[in-house]
Amino acid sequence: MVRLWCGKLRLWKPYLALATQSRNSWFCSGGGAPSHHLHILKKYGSSEITEMINRYKRNVAGHTLTQNSMVGQYKTTVSPSVAQNVTIETFDSLCIQGNWREAVEVLDYLENKGYAMDLIRLLGLAKLCGKPEALEAARVVHECIIALVSPCDVGARNAIIEMYSGCCSVDDALKVFEEMPEWNSGTLCVMMRCFVNNGYGEEAIDLFTRFKEEGNKPNGEIFNQVFSTCTLTGDVKEGSLQFQAMYREYGIVPSMEHYHSVTKMLATSGHLDEALNFVERMPMEPSVDVWETLMNLSRVHGDVELGDRCAELVEKLDATRLDKVSSAGLVATKASDFVKKEPSTRSEPYFYSTFRPVDSSHPQMNIIYETLMSLRSQLKEMGYVPDTRYYRSLIMAMENKEQIFGYREEIAVVESLLKSKPRSAITLLTNIRIVGDCHDMMKLMSVITGRDMIKRDAKIYHLFKNGVCRCNNLW
């Protein structure tokens, strides 16, 4: 255990540790055990902990009403005929399939029937609900987990914060963090990562500063998260100072992961010469991840020569990282990335659809293309010109800038516009890093359509609103 975040509570005797062992023996016992333990805590002057436990007991007593209220907001649709066959195995099967919607419905049904879901299953469901479209379901799972664990269960609350981070709900995550009676270094990293992934880099640095001011000693994991934060904010100076302080002030020897993070921080901000010099001065042989990162970011910033040089090193260290397209293009890819996927037919705005402009199999191809042409015309009027330096190899062989538009995520944007409610936000998910040209284009599209556009790439969320991205053009 570490000192509590509020800076007031500490561990008195072994009784608080005893309280964390069993929810039934401490908080929910029908006998005199709780009163006995409370008497001991009062004897040693722990009035704050006594109040915390009393508050928790009141929460447990009102759990049924609270949870039913939350679940009631999430409409369940288990039909009577299906309900007869619903078991815990049904819940497990849905979780394995990744079907979080029906899993939450089954969870509600089972708990109404008196079945107490165990913590392991709830944490597994929490991982499935860590996505923007599952926010309401995530809140239901949150209530179920909190009702099951003690106030001092740090791991469960870390998982809840991680879940809300994936849901793009920083407010919910921060509320959980601030209400935690105690935490550990993993909690700090999870909360900082939540800030960073959702575009709040400055808040993450403020949290780290607050951590040190409380007299805590950061470890290597926390420093690595600090470097990731500085990558987002573009604060190379702060990141460099923290890298030096890591060894000089705290005696932490940098690992390969730390060198990789600092390389990415320098290269992301366009300091390619400094990044190359940093890599060449490493006291160990740079890993393939380091060279691959420098390769990708060199091409992002237009230094094709350095990118090609790094690509040669990547190929020597791990030839599987590259193929014919990635060795001549922007980022390393896998063969599975080019497998044609079935067009999405979901009605909600949270989806990512990929298909070529020549793909006539999509049922709405005509109206999508008409909308695409209209948006393209408005983009031209606003001065948008496709930046061909980001597209080489097969795309450049077309010798037509107009076709570049349809070879990226923009068709998915158009499909989302057509299928979502007016003025509602659009969320796009992808497993590759967004390129500068697409980033500029989506800022303009947020102005044209009047929509907030959230794009989750391989690392962070980009929120495009009124022509501005929350990442401040640093990612």
UniProtKB/Swiss-Prot annotation:
Keywords, comma-separated and alphabetical: Mitochondrion, Repeat, Transit peptide
Single GO MF annotation: RNA binding
Name used for this protein in its record: Pentatricopeptide repeat-containing protein At1g29710, mitochondrial
Organism encoding this protein: Arabidopsis thaliana
Domain of life: Eukaryota
Interval spanned by the transit peptide: 1-37
Chain segments carrying region Type E(+) motif: 350-380
InterPro entries, per the entry: DYW_dom, Pentatricopeptide_rpt, PPR_At4g14850-like_plant, TPR-like_helical_dom_sf
GO cellular component: mitochondrion
Lineage summary: Eukaryota, Viridiplantae, Streptophyta, Embryophyta, Tracheophyta
Compartments where located: Mitochondrion
NCBIfam families membership: PPR (TIGR00756)
Sequence similarity: Belongs to the PPR family. PCMP-H subfamily.
Keyword Cell inner membrane: no
PPR repeat boundaries on the chain: 83-117, 118-148, 153-183, 184-218, 219-254, 255-285
Region ranges (Type DYW motif): 381-475
Principal location listed in the UniProt entry: mitochondrion
Gene Ontology biological process terms, A to Z: RNA modification
